[in-house]
Design a protein with these regions (language model features):
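Intrinsically disordered, low-complexity, charged terminal extensions of DNA damage-control enzymes
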Residues: 128, 140-278
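Catalytic cores of DNA base-excision repair glycosylases
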Residues: 1-152, 158-161, 167
Length: 278
């Protein structure tokens, strides 16, 4: 529900693949602003260009061609084939994973690994005539009935054979993924109540976006952080240092913190500005 207004705004401005392939990059980022994962929107445009050029403006209808497109992996390719093209495939999203874990009562780490779940999902079978509806029905079953907390088993069509229901145990075992902890020194330059930002060509995260000048600190013995921010699978510990001098060039960018909403900036940068102003 949270992303619906973003989706509607996106489709209103970019109704088809051809328009997406030509859409102005700054306006595209502005439309995406607030959703995070900016690599996804960059990949969307890259994919749109390829689809227009190589596939006659239509998404390919086979797994290998779909996976060759930027940003499309196993799940997305499976979801497109099942939902858009009615292929007899079950895309393994978080909701279907949850149904599967409870239905089969999977309680060990080795059982909830992606490879095993891909194999076990075959128990749900497929539909040859209504594959799209069937795939979405399984997703909705997880989202609306087999919820993470307080599953509504009375309404579940699978409860009679569900092993978690039989054992009255609905706790879920999650595959352990430890976030990588990183350390950065962030340099703050302030002049006339404005902050200096630079275009990021240095780090893999937020590539080509405006961020504060930063330096990565590897394996520090002592690190007194001022704040930490979560980004994807990374926890960023940040130490802030105020500076007086900086080598200016045309790629520098000054922002007024009182007009933050007027700039096209990643949420990461906005959070730091708000922290500095608090």
């Amino acid at each position: 529900a949270t992303v619906i207004p973003y989706f509607n705004r996106f489709i209103k401005n970019i109704p088809n693949i051809e328009k997406l392939s030509k859409f102005d990059n700054r306006k595209l980022i502005k439309l995406w602003e607030g959703l995070g994962y900016y690599s996804r929107v960059r990949n969307l445009k890259k994919t749109a260009k390829i689809v227009v050029k190589d596939f006659n403006k239509r998404l390919p209808q086979n797994f290998s061609d779909l996976k060759s497109l930027p940003g499309i992996g196993d799940y997305t390719a499976s979801a497109i084939l099942a939902i858009a093209f009615n292929e007899p495939i079950i895309p393994l999203d978080g909701n279907i994973e949850r149904v599967l874990k409870r239905y089969l009562y999977l309680k060990k780490q080795i059982q909830v690994k992606k490879e095993n779940l891909q194999e076990q999902k075959k128990i749900f079978g497929t539909s040859t005539k209504r594959s799209s509806d069937y795939a979405q029905a399984l997703m909705e079953l997880g989202a609306l009935i087999c919820k993470p907390i307080n599953p509504n088993c009375k309404k579940c069509p699978l409860s009679k054979k569900c092993k978690s229901f039989k054992n009255n145990d609905f706790d879920l075992v999650k595959s352990i993924k430890k976030d990588k902890e990183t350390f950065y020194k962030l340099n703050v330059y302030k002049k006339n109540n404005q902050y200096l930002l630079i275009k990021n060509n240095k780090f893999n995260f937020l590539k080509n976006f405006n961020i504060f000048p930063m330096e990565k600190i590897n394996n520090p013995k002592y690190f007194n952080k001022d704040l930490n921010l979560k980004m994807s699978n990374m926890i960023m510990n940040i130490k802030i240092e105020y500076k007086n001098k900086y080598n200016l060039n045309k790629k520098n960018y000054w922002i007024d913190p009182s007009k933050l909403q007027n700039y096209t900036l990643p949420t990461f940068t906005k959070k730091i500005v708000k922290f500095l102003e608090s």
